[in-house]
Amino acid sequence: MISNDDFCTALADRGFDFVAGVPCSYFSGPIERLTRDGVYLPAANEGAALAAAAGAAVAGHRAAVIAQNSGLGNLVNPLASLTATYGIPVLVFMSLRGWPDPSQDEPQHEVMGLATHKLLDAMDVPHLTVPATATTADLADVLDHADAELAAGRTVFVLTQKGAIEKAAGAGSAGAVAAGAAAVAAEPGAGTAEPDAGAASRARAEGLGRVEVLRAIEHLLEGAAVVSTTGYTSRELFGVTGSKSHFYMQGSMGHAAAFGLGVALREPGTPVVVLDGDGAALMHLGTLSTVGAEAPDNFVHVVFDNGSYESTGGQVTTSHSTRFAVVAEGAGYASARVCDTADAVTEALAAALGGGGPHLIVVPVAKAGASAFSRATAAMTTTDIREGFAARLRGEEHSGGG
């Protein structure tokens, strides 16, 4: 058996300073230790954990994920369209519930236990195994092989059997309870939400456009690390700015905020602006809670709300019944505003970039129909996008792309 200390020391010795995850009892010991050391980010779901780790990785840090294989389905989206597509190396420790003998585990683990290896193989994801009989030397050997995959820009899974790693003293252990209490001790948002119920309908009726807003705030974005959600938002941001330093997401819908959070937590001196959409934000609304709990003061979250999935044909979302500003305030954001003019957005963003976050700015906009702009990948590769954003974080210029 590998002790908690040996497991965490092995990660630290190899430079891993960011671990996000969703708990499994197989990893209860390391999670308790990593939480105590201030290295662990408790994510709302496994996909968000991977997206946050990807953000930290692009920011130049070695990042890992801890999860149970029952959550592999949640990982598939960012695994297939973020880390694989952009060549982002993340180390994923995943427990092997329901394997090798499903009858020795709970019934809900049977299907995934038998399918885990096959699913990873189908996605061409490299994976290694830490058996129940593993020693610290065995772990070192596995990590040596994993490092080779990471060096090639690939996300790699380390599948971990029951009993391989020492468990925590108990679910209610003093360390875990103390860490949890500290995490919730901070006051929630400062009561600055401005949930103007009529703002959305007014802005949509008056035709406030996302492109209009992007043009108005373009000069402010030049001083920030910008992450834009998939769909028309990324197309229009690239079309308006032409910047090769923003991170344009194509895929991994709903995970822009988690990716930006990973960047913000590891680059506290850099303002991080996430340009999100209502449909994407709704898809992983739990990430707002993670942002509020971590409370990075350099994090600004802008949600363009047009009440639709515009790039897939304008199908309606449920944002009409969701008051994002109120949700964000309840989740612990320092401020949340609804802005229904380009001038108001500009003023709010300028203030938010001064720090004291996390801040949410909701921008009700009209549906624009088909976008007049091409995807960023019409001019750059996904590698160019990753490297351009990483160079921005290092304070350098990147000349990649056409």
Feature-to-residue mapping (PLM):
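Thiamine diphosphate
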Residues: 1-121, 125-152, 156-259, 265-266, ...
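A short alpha/beta connector and helix-capping loop motif
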Residues: 80, 284-305
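A short, acidic, amphipathic alpha-helical segment used as a generic capping/interface helix at domain edges
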Residues: 147, 341-354
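Active-site regions of oxyanion-processing enzymes, predominantly non-cytosolic
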Residues: 155-159, 358-363
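Active-site flanking residues adjacent to catalytic metal/cofactor-binding acidic residues
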Residues: 160, 275-278, 304, 363
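Residue-level marker for buried hydrophobic side chains located in beta-strands
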Residues: 226, 272-275, 302
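DG-centered beta-turn motif at the end of beta-strands
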Residues: 270-281, 286-288
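Long, charge-dense
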Residues: 307-314
